[in-house]
Amino acid sequence: MVLWESPRQCSSWTLCEGFCWLLLLPVMLLIVARPVKLAAFPTSLSDCQTPTGWNCSGYDDRENDLFLCDTNTCKFDGECLRIGDTVTCVCQFKCNNDYVPVCGSNGESYQNECYLRQAACKQQSEILVVSEGSCATDAGSGSGDGVHEGSGETSQKETSTCDICQFGAECDEDAEDVWCVCNIDCSQTNFNPLCASDGKSYDNACQIKEASCQKQEKIEVMSLGRCQDNTTTTTKSEDGHYARTDYAENANKLEESAREHHIPCPEHYNGFCMHGKCEHSINMQEPSCRCDAGYTGQHCEKKDYSVLYVVPGPVRFQYVLIAAVIGTIQIAVICVVVLCITRKCPRSNRIHRQKQNTGHYSSDNTTRASTRLI
């Protein structure tokens, strides 16, 4: 007599135990690799604003200095904004007109402490409050001319001290003919063209500070971008000396970026772009719209369904590659498990049915033999 046995379960652990480690492998790779979230370049200030301040490091591929925005280029409470294709540092302090004069560490007097901080932001150099009230006249008025009134003896005495070194200059008492030395390194400062009060264009605020230190005169940032009627600036050469650089040599390199320069539209254009930013081009009188991702049209009113993917930068391409490999492995494992189940289950059921039929056949033969004997 053959007892009936329940069919074996095809989805048992023994069937797929050889593939479990393949399922765990992608999970382990995800835990170890932890790819960062892909994101496009920030389109507004809120995209990079964190509780601790401005931080665009997650968007920075270090390929083009035009799109860098970090604490080294916009310090002293400056606000880093993107205007068109350029990132600029804006110092918009809402200072009141209260007259509470303070003396700054650069030897200049300011109407109040707010104006001192605003000057530090524009010059991108640290200016501390030395004392309350205006700076003493004998210590220099802060005009930067380096000339001290008085007799020739008094003037000679003053020039033999380090009091004349201003605007970030350091005094070198061991030098024979040069008292003030400017140890300012602008090699790591990002490109952010500015127009200074001396009518010259500079690549960044650090170069303005450097020129102010070298000339020992007050040079401030007047406007963003290059000066309209100027072609020269001062730069430091490898031997530490200063030389004038003709901007005409680099005009071709900067022409493309200047050509695409845009400025935000006035407030009365609010609502001109439905899903984007309103901008004015320097070559166009009518405003234009810079649409957000997924939108198109003159006023960004149409949805663009062709935007189905984001092209990552080369720095993040390795994370995309890891994710693609993990996805491929998971699909392959699922296919193998499905094939395993579909091939082994019918075979197991077929063997069970054969055994069951064999048992019934033997039982019928025994019954027939007994009947014949009777």
From Swiss-Prot:
The record marks N97, D98, Q188, T189 as: Reactive bond. Residues 41-320 are extracellular. The keyword Oxidoreductase does not apply. Keywords: Disulfide bond, EGF-like domain, Glycoprotein, Membrane, Proteoglycan, Repeat, Secreted, Signal, Transmembrane, Transmembrane helix. Residues 342-374 are cytoplasmic. The keyword Repeat applies. InterPro entries: EGF-like_dom, Kazal_dom, Kazal_dom_sf. The chain crosses the membrane at residues 321-341. Residues 90-137, 181-229 form the Kazal-like domain. Residues 356-374 have a biased composition (Polar residues). Pfam families: Kazal_2 (PF07648). One of its GO terms (cellular component) is membrane. O-glycosylated; contains chondroitin sulfate glycosaminoglycans. A soluble form (TMEFF2-ECD) is produced by proteolytic shedding. This shedding can be induced by phorbol ester or pro-inflammatory cytokines such as TNFalpha, and is mediated by ADAM17. It comes from the Eukaryota. Induction: Down-regulated in tumor cell lines in response to a high level of methylation in the 5' region. The CpG island methylation correlates with TMEFF2 silencing in tumor cell lines. GO terms for biological process: cell differentiation; negative regulation of cell migration; negative regulation of integrin biosynthetic process; negative regulation of stress fiber assembly; wound healing, spreading of cells. SUPFAM superfamilies: EGF/Laminin, Kazal-type serine protease inhibitors. PROSITE patterns: EGF_1, EGF_2, EGF_3, KAZAL_2. May be a survival factor for hippocampal and mesencephalic neurons. The shedded form up-regulates cancer cell proliferation, probably by promoting ERK1/2 phosphorylation. This is Tomoregulin-2. It comes from Homo sapiens (Human).
